[in-house]
Amino acid sequence: MKKRALYSICLLLSGSLTAWGQSDPIAIFHNDLRVFLGENGATKAPTGSADMWLSVEQENEWIPLIFQSGLWLGGLDDESTLLVTDLTEGGQPGTLEAPEGFDRIWQVTAEEIEQHRADLADNGLVDEPLEAIYGWPAVGNPHFLDYSGFELPDSPLAGLAPFWDQNADGLYDPDDGDFPILSVRGCDIPIIPTQMSWCIFTMFMDQEQVRPIECQLILFTFACEEAHPLNNTIFLHYRLVHRVEPGGSALFDTRLGWYLDPDLGCLLDDYVGSFPDRFAGFAYNRSNEDVGCESLPGLGTNPPAIGFDLLRGPLTIENNELVDVDISHIMPFYSPIFGSFPSGTTDPSNLSEYYNYLQGFWRDGTPLTVGGIGYGGSQTTQFAFPGFPAQPGAWTEWEANNPDGDRRLLMAYEPFELQAGAVNEVIAAITLYRDGADHLDQVVGLRDQLDQVQAYYDLCFQVENAGDLPPCTQVLTDVGEPAPAAHWSFFPNPAFQTLQIDIPDQKRGDLALYDLTGRLCASWAEIEDETAIQLGALPPGLYVLTLTDSQGRQSSQKLLVVQ
């Protein structure tokens, strides 16, 4: 079927020869796309399977799109020792302090989140708790042990799974109105994809395991009722934490890249290219008929093009401020098994060769150059095969009539210093376009679709209120931004007979008191700010007090009544 040559070096680069989390990955379905995710963060084809990492369904058959993908990270320690790790194969499931129990993937849908919010809103209590919500691995979750069978670590640097913190106490509790979200730096509004799959794993950049990289990975999608670009797009959100010991050294001349191995049906007849001004890469078919090969089915007539977009990358410090690291290069390299390519352009086999590619050089250290396959020329460049395939006189694989073979693509950033404890985000999108007139026109439409994907990201994925962009009505759910909580307080707590209510913002509201079965025990209409209410002869115990303010916003707090 497909090559396995890159696998052995990937295991070596993991920093440990221990086989972490090698059980089968789960399949995630989105529209007619299928992608796999390993509980250890692996983003590759299932081991020993004829399946690809990403496939599309055509006529009841899964057709290949991408064999595998993953982040590469490399740099120099304070003794100038080269360290490189490859996240394609994943790592040790769990956080650095608590690996046990994390050999699984947590999944949640927008429908479940909306159901939870509606359940809480009707009476201030959750009557039908959902496992996806109550078992979400977020910091402070008091229900996690009951649903998952093990305790969460106390204070991981990366904060575990992201959530909407309704009362801003820093702890996740669905009973307080909290719920899972996608958290993106700079976006202060909750992002609720149609589906999210979350895992956490740890990579070690050295055999001594003293330089760990803790990684959270969320694979997320938006499913729209309309015919929409997001129906053909999957997103990857990495959060990387450099978990060296306190006082540990930085990683210098750090390079971060995204590696992809596209196989559009037959793996031998694909071309690749780049849109440098968008920092996006793509793959397309060299002919308008994709016939199966090497036991892989083809995509048939007018095969689609697929695009790869890095929406967010690492940060560095300049003039005491955090700034985004600029793009560096997009370049291909080639399989040594399929096709006849110079050995200096094929898969890396040691740390130095990986680092060469991360720096924008070929495996043998020579630069990427204009012309042919990008090797051995005199004019150096950073971006291979830029622009649309059909450009007379331009350097593209189509115009160069490059030979058949199995291509990979690497998209990388400029060097930066990875400080001890640094937290970086990488957000990547993979989008399929198939509405073009032919295999070359697919790339023209793909560029516009990549622009739309970037625009949704720029709007913090508020897909249902996206201005001039095509609206996306999420399938099976109606999710909007949650109303801000009513601002109020009461004291004392615990209380005996009298309770004072403070509503400083709205000055008045309606108050309801429920017991833990959801039964309404008492209510007060038009309560004003700084009002004392009488609790009467309530039995001692725990209650829920819900305020509805003059704008219809609700907020619930727990009240302990004592004798």
Outline where the language-model segments fall.
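Conserved beta-strand and immediately adjacent loop positions that scaffold enzyme active sites
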Residues: 160, 237, 480, 510, ...
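C-terminal outer-membrane/trafficking sorting elements
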Residues: 483-563
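A long-range scaffold signal marking pre-active-site subdomains of enzyme folds
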Residues: 22-475
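Single, functionally critical "micro-switch" positions that shape active/binding sites
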Residues: 16, 168, 420, 491-492
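Bacterial Sec-dependent N-terminal signal peptides
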Residues: 1-25, 476-480
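Residue-level detector of functionally pivotal "anchor" positions at catalytic/ligand-binding pockets or at interdomain
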Residues: 463-491, 506
